[in-house]
Amino acid sequence: MELVITGSNNKVSVSEAVFGREFSEDLVHQVVVAYRNAGRAGTKAQKTRSEVAGTTKKSKKQKGGGARHGALTAPIFVGGGVTFAAKPRSFEQKVNRKMYRAAICAIFSELNRQGRLMIVDAFDLEATKTKDLIEKLKGLDVGKRPLIVTEEASEHLYLSARNLPYVQVRDVQGLDPVALVGADTVVITADAVKKVEEWLA
């Protein structure tokens, strides 16, 4: 299949397996959730009644008309332990390489179908100027949250986009499903398209 390069009459031939794949919502959801879970610290820690510092001596006598109480480390007391205390754990989920790549292909294909994938000849700046980047993006009409994908990392481009909170810049090696799904428009260079195909084909 062929896709038009924005701003010219040229076309680029792309693999249908990468940019024309059927969209699987379940697959993409599973991979996105797994990717986000892998970024969780999982360091939350609370103490149970047996771990809280304090005496376990009975706090008051059994009889006398009041409620029956034992140790002050019980969960019902302030400063006592937590009933179902959270412990550090890993939230990581196993995702096969084949599944991950299939999900990336499905996302690219859906972006293409929805007209949210924009291919350009090149995307670079001569100097580190945020103003220049803003003007360039306005000319492309990419929406509020664009993702710019280049073949290799560009220092001028990265630094210019750094203080634009909704603009993301990635090279092909740094692509991930969350960035692709969250973008209004993905602006990708023709060279980056070829590199994506090499990675996913």
Swiss-Prot record:
InterPro entries: Ribosomal_uL4 (IPR002136), Ribosomal_uL4-like (IPR013005), Ribosomal_uL4_dom_sf (IPR023574). GO terms for biological process: translation. Pfam families: Ribosomal_L4 (PF00573). One of its GO terms (molecular function) is structural constituent of ribosome. Residues 44-68 are annotated as: Disordered. Gene3D superfamilies: 3.40.1370.10. GO terms for cellular component: ribonucleoprotein complex; ribosome. Keywords: Ribonucleoprotein, Ribosomal protein, RNA-binding, rRNA-binding. Part of the 50S ribosomal subunit. Belongs to the universal ribosomal protein uL4 family. This is Large ribosomal subunit protein uL4. The gene is rplD.
